[in-house]
């Protein structure tokens, strides 16, 4: 039997296989147990029917998988990161605790589980075409955040609640570690943030890339999270700088655009006075210098009363 199952209102959300290093087993044995000993077609483990995520854990490390598929089951690390290479978990300051104490002290608590269900877990849809037959198929993947993604979003959101637009931030992700989804989660959560007086902290979230066209992966990630029409405006290669001007001057909550469009409208955005912006920059190392970035800052701070927060990735 599965070692541990967490339910919310009768629905299985998380399963866990637990191993004890001092007994000669570790997290890799837990992963192997999921791959070889567990029936992925059972009601509890069947993809999109059973539990949302499956954790393999020992006393030092945690791995996760959202789609069990026998020996092909792919597990990703769900660790806090440790040292320069970022692998594993740090030694706890409190020596009475384990390296994986964050799981039951944070991740498995009621508030965090509800937050994950409400704001993070989603179905990623992508269209794949058979190169031989030309038949297109919609592929669906259940996305559960890795620990570093959840941590980055929560830390910025909690700080923004206090400081609003008075600070800027930098998120560092290694290649292939899910930067695109981190941007998508952050843009949606920031668009709903309110202060103590129930006023919106931001009027508009601008997700910006320095590529000539909006990155398709970034575009799809943000659109996959939207449940309301009219909330997001993606300014792809068919849109002009004037479309960007209209979106910023209007009431669109999330605008996805290229940085180049700002150069043509920086002197024309007049209705943004008293507006508050959050600017999420994709590939910041290539974007935060030069005339394009100066145009962005000029456009969004055109008024003495408008303000912008910049989050670079």
Where are these predicted regions, by residue range?
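A generic structural motif
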Residues: 44-51, 230-241, 309
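SF2 helicase catalytic motif II
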Residues: 272-306
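Conserved SAM-binding loop
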Residues: 145, 207, 312
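Conserved helicase motor
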Residues: 212, 234-243, 259-264
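Residues immediately C-terminal
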Residues: 214, 261, 286-287, 312
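Short beta-strand/turn micro-motifs composed of small residues
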Residues: 57-58, 209, 281
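Structural recognition of the conserved hydrophobic beta-strand(s) that form the central parallel beta-sheet
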Residues: 55-56, 255-258, 304-313
């Amino acid at each position: 039997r599965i070692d541990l199952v967490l339910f919310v209102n009768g629905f299985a959300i998380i399963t866990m296989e637990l191993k004890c290093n001092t007994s000669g087993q570790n997290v890799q044995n837990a992963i192997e147990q999921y791959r070889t000993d567990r029936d992925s077609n059972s009601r509890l483990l069947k993809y999109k029917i059973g539990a949302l995520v499956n954790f393999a854990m020992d006393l030092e490390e945690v791995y996760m998988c959202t789609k069990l598929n026998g020996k092909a089951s792919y597990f990703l690390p769900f660790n806090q990161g440790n040292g320069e290479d970022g692998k594993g978990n740090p030694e706890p300051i409190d020596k009475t605790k384990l390296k994986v104490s964050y799981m039951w002290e944070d991740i498995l608590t009621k508030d965090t589980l509800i937050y994950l269900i409400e704001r993070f877990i989603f179905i990623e849809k992508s269209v794949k075409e058979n190169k031989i037959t030309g038949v297109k198929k919609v592929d669906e993947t259940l996305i559960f955040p890795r620990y570093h993604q959840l941590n980055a979003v929560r830390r910025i959101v909690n700080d923004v609640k206090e400081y609003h637009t008075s600070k800027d931030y930098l998120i560092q992700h290694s290649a292939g570690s899910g930067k695109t989804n981190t941007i998508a989660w952050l843009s949606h959560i920031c668009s709903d943030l309110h202060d103590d007086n129930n006023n919106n902290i931001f009027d508009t979230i601008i997700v910006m890339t320095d590529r000539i066209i909006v990155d398709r992966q970034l575009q799809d990630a943000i659109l996959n999270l939207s449940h309301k029409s009219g909330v997001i405006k993606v300014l792809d290669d068919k849109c002009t700088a004037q479309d960007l001007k209209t979106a910023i001057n209007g009431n669109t909550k999330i605008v996805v655009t290229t940085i180049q469009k700002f150069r043509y409208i920086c002197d024309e955005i007049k209705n943004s006075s008293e507006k508050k912006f959050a600017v999420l920059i994709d590939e910041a190392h290539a974007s935060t210098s030069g005339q394009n970035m100066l145009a962005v800052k000029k456009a969004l701070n055109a008024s003495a009363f408008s303000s912008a927060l910049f989050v670079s990735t």
